[in-house]
Design a protein with these regions (language model features):
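Charged, compositionally biased N-terminal leader segments and the immediate start
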Residues: 1-22
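Amphipathic alpha-helical packing elements
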Residues: 16-53
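Active-site recognition of the HExxH zinc-binding catalytic motif
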Residues: 38, 145-161
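A generic secondary-structure signal for well-formed alpha-helical elements
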Residues: 53-56, 158-162
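Auxiliary, metal-adjacent structural segments of Zn-dependent hydrolase domains
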Residues: 54-144
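Active-site metal-coordination segments of metallo-dependent hydrolases
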Residues: 144-145, 175
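Post-HExxH zinc-binding segment in Zn-dependent metallohydrolases
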Residues: 160-175
């Protein structure tokens, strides 16, 4: 019963957001990985991306101006690892924070040899356990065949579902 209610709520939120197939195509059409997804699989990825945005907010870091196209692109990339698992695998967190470029977290950082520095190194992405995913828009745009900061950080979120990260996120059989 709860799943039916959640599905109903997601559909209402997606409809209220008003994203269209054409907007989605314009936002992600130049991403090479998307060419792997055709027909029904592509439609499921699009619909899952819309539902992702119904459940998660995308917030600006350092007053960065965010567009709907940016949100659609991030959501689509985020949904690739869970296309066969389902959106519930991203439960327990609610926000993607988007900076224009790489960012420096405001916290101490310890190197492998034990030296503690006042601040962390520059990052392109970060995932917090039961917290937000933080991304650099410049790094999102650099996503290609060999790297993708969104998929990388979302894999960490999946990995963290099992009482902390162990380096083995759940993957569906086709991955």
């Amino acid at each position: 019963m709860f799943a039916a209610w959640r599905n109903w709520r997601d559909k209402r939120r997606v409809k209220k957001m008003g994203y269209t197939e054409a907007e989605w195509d314009a936002a992600v059409g130049d991403w090479p990985v998307l060419q792997r997804y055709q027909g029904d699989e592509r439609a499921r990825l699009r619909d899952l991306s819309f539902r992702f945005l119904a459940r998660k907010s995308v917030a600006p870091g350092n007053h960065f101006a965010i567009t709907d196209a940016m949100c659609l692109r991030i959501a689509t990339m985020a949904c690739v690892p869970i296309l066969e698992l389902g959106l519930d695998w991203y439960d327990g967190w609610y926000t993607v924070i988007l900076y224009e470029g790489d960012f420096i977290p405001n916290r101490p950082w310890q190197t492998e040899d034990g030296v503690v520095h006042a601040s962390s190194p520059v990052l392109a992405g970060e995932a917090w356990h039961q917290g937000p995913v933080i991304l650099s828009w410049e790094s999102v745009l650099e996503a290609g065949q060999g790297s993708n900061v969104v998929i990388h950080e979302m894999s960490h979120k999946l990995d963290m579902r099992r009482n902390g990260a162990n380096g083995a996120p759940p993957l569906h059989p086709g991955m």
